[in-house]
Amino acid sequence: MEHNFVPLLLGADINVYSMARAFHEAYGVETIAYGMYPSGPCYGSDIIDYRVRENNDDPEVVLRSVTEVAQEFPTKQVLVLGCGDNYLTAIAENLPRFPANVVAPYIDLQLMETLIHKEKFYELCDRYGIDHPATFVYKKGMGHDFELPFPGPFVVKPAESATYWDHPFDTQKKAYVLQTRQEVDAVIDQIYGAGYEDALILQDFIPGDDSYMRVVTNYSGEDGKVRLMCVGHVLLEEHTRHGIGNHAVIITEDEPALCEQLRNFLEDIKFTGFSNFDVKFDQRDGKFKVFEINCRQGRSNYYVTGAGYNLARYLVEDRIEHKPCQLTVTKNRHLWRVIPAKVAYDYIPSRYHAEMRALIEQGAWVNPLFYRADRNLIHKLRILRDQWRYKERYASSMEKAN
């Protein structure tokens, strides 16, 4: 069946592949994706027209890529999604410059920059009564003569991620969990010594392993009303230096109070498009603490589609078909994983194993990278090879669970 839209995704990772799979499952369409390198889960896929483009996240390059596809399909609407933080501001900057047949479901640049800057986001959380970890904002030049209002362990992370990664150094991490104040001072010196200029976020470490984490994925319509909310209970994350915090295993769950609070926030700021919140349950006071908002679908987004709520369909019905839609807050249990089962059982606490096995026996589980309709043999073999490597990655980065 011919459709009047073309999906255009920017990026090359599992986020892109998961959304491309959602589009293919819902509409049978091939997705165009631009990535920087001839590698990753999109490269060689039968469901993706994968195009390599140098400096793919540069705003001018993004404009060129989007314009080319819009001209290639002049009678269709081009749905543009950025599948990484590095693409979001490039898209937002170009919203007024995109061709008329381009649909980019994003908020304006000013609001986006407020939300993705952690210091400004936490100020909004305080205004809306959204709990977050106890926080100290460190500004360049403060030196070591300051007091933290909470004991260790401590978390150190950049307030602004994009420019942080523009200044690499050997021990660079997405976030640091540190035991002593001396370690905090040393990491601060390393980060600013590499050339980073913005603020750092120093936080109270919320105790608990990966299984205390939650992810909340949402879709807000063009009218600013939330149409879909799905909470994922994270059972395991990745622990490599650059992958730390990436979800590896999730079971969907129902958290109505958390969803209601976040829905009110999203609708009040008139958010549109996909969003996801990283959250951790604090067993000390029984509260969910929000870490950050991403103004996009996360790399684990298929946990929502796999549970029966196809993200591509929500987007198309809103922005292309202009259909009304009532809010759906998901309730069913479903297992999502991107690592082999053996690795999952080795590193996830045993108290979750029974439900994991039950969901697998019921067929209520998915690994988004294994899609029957994607028949390219070489692509499948590369995915299998990468799955095998997870055993070594976890063995070198964390201890097995009890």
Residues covered by each model-derived region:
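ATP-binding N-terminal substructure of ATP-dependent carboxylate-amine bond-forming enzymes
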Residues: M1-I107, G141-D145, D386-K400
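Active-site nucleotide/adenylate-binding loops and adjacent lid/helix of ATP-dependent enzymes
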Residues: T114-L200, E222-D223
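Phosphate-binding site of ATP-dependent enzymes
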Residues: L178-E238, E253-E260, F281, F288-K289
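Flexible, glycine/charged-enriched surface loops at secondary-structure junctions
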Residues: I201, F274-N276, C325-T330
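Oxyanion-binding "anion nests"
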Residues: G243-I244, E253-F277
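Conserved metal-phosphate-binding beta-hairpin within the catalytic cores
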Residues: L266-Y302
